[in-house]
Amino acid sequence: MARSLYSKFVLGYLIFGLLSVLTIATFSSGITRDYLIKDRANALYDEANDIAASCSLMYQGQHQDMDLFSTQLKNVSTYLRTEIWVVNKSGVVIMDSKNGARIHTIIPDFDPTATGNRSYTIGTYYKLFDQNVLSVSAPVTGNYTTYGYVLIHLPVSEIADSQSHILDILYMTCAIIFALSLV
């Protein structure tokens, strides 16, 4: 009888451990991914607005050193691990953060309102990327006119890497709690 009770206890304990890992793998993974996407999108949107405000200075009659601006664009891009484009209203890239690799690229059927009520989109951005990217845009305005847009693209793989690191922490915490519950 005692042996049967002990085996049931061990079986219940193992089932509890398995259910804990499955819960982390399903619920926590999705919640973490959604949180990271929204968090990165908000941070990139704020950065895009800052860059757009800097671009807007030249439309307000202030001089802008384009070489300095280009260098700053590259530095921000490197720091954020993103690709940054400045495009005109027609969707032609006029400046980028990758040493001009995308300059004069035409974004087919460019529609800055395509994001709807969200501040970001996820996809290959008009099939211009080989992998999915998180893209945000901010208008470049001056004198109540929109002259173009600042677009920032973050590879979704960067978000997946962060998600993986966070889930590793959750799995380790689960294992520690599981081991400590034996005491």
Residue ranges and their predicted role:
Residues 59, 141-143, 151-171:
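Helix-start (N-cap) segments at beta->loop->alpha junctions
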Residues 84, 134-137, 153:
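Amphipathic alpha-helical bundle/coiled-coil segments
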Residues 121, 129-141, 148:
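A short beta-strand signature within small-molecule sensing/ligand-binding domains used
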